[in-house]
């Protein structure tokens, strides 16, 4: 008998994602002007207010207020009625210097022996059920919200859309773990109060709310979903769409109050959305606002890079990779592999892990250099997932009245590159 599996995603306008994007925008600007910056930036967003806190060691000086306001404006919080607006919200900073006790564990005379910025375990996961080696349920959940954001920005249809939104996708699998159909799609999107009640009575209000909901539900099914389907170019995924999909659209009936006014947002509260949607495992460490000396981030990217290349090379159909560190120690304590019984090589998972240890240098500095993590590449990761994205080179411009303007070419999502497949095939005789 088969089973159902569900993953969720949240939009760039979700309050926790607003916080993530501000934290990573601060990180990017510091790295742009001082690549050696050590950063741990946390953000809180609520009604009309942004609070920044954390620890930083840098030679750069940046305008934190301006960074926060630019992010909020780009997301789309530009109207006073949202109760959180880029020009009028308060921005309070409580950022201070990094602890020298932490820094002494990271800095080394030999840069390659740079210690891990903290203890912990990090996981990478990959599966061959999608072209980007991501869980299908999460990939679709991200895609729905990316298309919804495109529609909102175009402003031609569904003109009532506001920035906050969530999605959830449930996939039915057979006994072999193969997706067979999409079972349920949930879309909750913030919207304008675009139909006013005829009078102040409760019945009139309910009637207006029901009319709005009917329009939103129709538009999600007839406008949003066809565009989502049109963006998919994988025949096996397209075949999973069917006329029996259950749609839950704004199930509470109304979603006018949203964003940071509806829910307080914090950096690092969407770690499953950021990674694998509940598949694989998670060590608990969030990513956004952390420079790559924090192995919570850099080692998680490295583990994903390993898992994706291993699956792409044909070592297994699905793979989980764990690495762990002690603070101040360069080399990982362990490498663990789980192929879920879906390996294609005549080796135990422990033996596979030992080959990985020989192929990949997992010291923090080596990870930084291999994946080019000392570049300002992080704001793009802070919405719609850190994994499964398309590697690309982009030109980024930074403006500073203190440091001068700067233009840099950077490579995004380097951990998604399939650049170790040939080495892995050679090592495993594939």
Cite the ranges covered by each PLM segment.
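Glycine-rich, mobile lid/loop segments that gate access to catalytic sites or pores
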Residues: 6, 66, 73-257, 388, ...
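C-terminal catalytic subdomain
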Residues: 269-271, 276-320, 331-338
């Amino acid at each position: 008998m088969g089973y159902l599996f569900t993953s969720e995603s949240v939009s760039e306008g979700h309050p926790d994602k607003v916080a993530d994007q501000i934290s990573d925008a601060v990180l990017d600007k510091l790295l742009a002007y001082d690549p050696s910056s050590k950063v741990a930036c946390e953000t809180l967003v609520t009604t009309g207010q942004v609070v920044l806190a954390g620890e930083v060691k840098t030679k750069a000086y940046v305008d934190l207020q301006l960074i926060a306001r630019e992010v909020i404006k780009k997301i789309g919080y530009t109207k006073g009625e949202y109760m959180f607006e880029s020009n009028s919200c308060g921005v309070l900073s409580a950022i201070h210097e990094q602890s020298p006790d932490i820094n002494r564990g990271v800095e080394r005379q030999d840069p390659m022996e740079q210690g891990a910025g903290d203890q912990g375990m990090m996981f990478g996961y990959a599966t061959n059920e999608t072209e980007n080696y991501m869980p299908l349920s999460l990939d679709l959940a991200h895609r729905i919200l990316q298309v919804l954001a495109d529609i909102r920005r175009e402003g031609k249809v569904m003109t009532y859309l506001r920035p906050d939104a969530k999605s959830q996708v449930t996939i039915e699998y057979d006994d072999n773990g193969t997706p067979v159909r999409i079972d349920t799609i949930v879309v909750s999107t913030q919207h304008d109060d675009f139909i006013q009640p005829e009078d102040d009575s409760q019945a009139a209000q309910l009637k207006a709310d029901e009319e709005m909901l009917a329009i939103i539900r129709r538009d999600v099914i007839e406008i949003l979903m066809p565009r989502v389907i049109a963006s998919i170019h994988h025949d096996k995924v397209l075949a999973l769409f069917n006329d029996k999909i259950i749609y839950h659209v704004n199930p509470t009936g109304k979603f006018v109050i949203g964003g940071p006014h509806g829910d307080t947002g914090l950096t690092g509260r969407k770690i499953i959305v950021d990674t694998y949607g509940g598949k694989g495992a998670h060590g608990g460490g969030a990513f956004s606002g952390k420079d790559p000396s924090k192995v919570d981030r850099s080692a998680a990217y490295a583990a994903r890079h390993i898992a994706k290349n291993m699956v792409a090379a044909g070592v297994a159909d699905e793979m989980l990779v764990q690495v762990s560190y002690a603070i101040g120690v360069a080399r990982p304590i362990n490498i663990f592999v789980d192929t879920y019984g879906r390996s294609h090589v005549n080796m135990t998972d422990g033996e596979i892990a030992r080959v990985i240890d020989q192929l990949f240098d997992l010291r923090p500095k080596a990870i930084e250099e291999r994946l080019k993590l000392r570049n300002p590449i992080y704001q793009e990761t802070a919405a719609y997932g850190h994994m499964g994205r398309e590697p690309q080179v982009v030109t980024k411009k930074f403006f500073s009245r203190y440091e001068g303007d700067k233009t840099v070419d950077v490579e995004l999502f380097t951990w998604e590159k399939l650049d170790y497949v040939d080495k892995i095939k050679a090592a495993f005789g594939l």
